[in-house]
Amino acid sequence: MKKNLTAAVFGMIALSIGAVSLARPVSAAWKDIKGLPDVRSWESGNAVIEDAVSAVCIDWSAGDIDVICGEGSSLLIEESSEKEIPEEERLCWYLSGSTLYIKYSSVKSFFHFGKSLNKHLTVTLPEDSRLEKLEIDSSAGDVNTAVSAEYLEMDCSAGDAVIRTEDPVKTMDLDFSAGDISLEAGEIEKLEIDSSAGAVEFSAAGIGSMDIDVSAGSVKGELTSFDSGEIDISAGSLELKLPSDANFTMKADISAGSLNSDIPFQKQGKTYIFGEGKAKLDIDISAGNVNILEKQSIGQ
């Protein structure tokens, strides 16, 4: 009996030690990247990076994230917390070519499972920077970005997001489990938004194609133009602000709710034709109203 008890104790100790040694695994999304070393060999702590950076990839477990542009010529990585950050829990970062990887670090043991320190990450890019890619994976915390990137990907489990960008974006892919999304952009070639619970509000000068899927929450959009789009809402309303000369064909399937429009249209069954009907928009609303509003011109 004593031998079994001793073995169990040593087993628990080994488990806790193992948990510590595995507390900093490389993100699953990064494991297949050639040449990316084990995170234990990365640099740690706040940093000033003088080298050119074309892509930023962030994996953050607990705390808010800000990605902004500054006035200097260097890239700054800073984390802060209401509590003192132990040396072994400082963020990890690695520069592979011109791609910067930043990872939340938390040394956990069996006896401290689930206790992650809430840390605020701020990444400040050089003035007038334009990234090829910005990728953010956040488990819990709000995200704020005000930078230029050709490709923007966000995967957030719990937290709101505010996204501001004026320069053209090729692809923007936002996947949120719980949290509101606020987006202001210029031209976007391809926009994909998947939200399980939360409100979505976006405005853009123009969108090539858009695919918006919201399980529970309202969607508000303001557009100058678009080529094609699909909007699927299980429970929530849809409001679109469009120019008075909007030119699109909309197929609407609304199970429980009504459709109202300030812009004239021709109706053919479940199809609504605005102008000559050039662009295509399919909407599917299970429970909620659809409102098409006229976008006010500047000066009105």
Regions picked out by a protein language model, each given a short descriptive name:
Residues 2-88, 107-131, 143-145, 262-278, ...:
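Short acidic/polar N-terminal linker immediately downstream of export determinants
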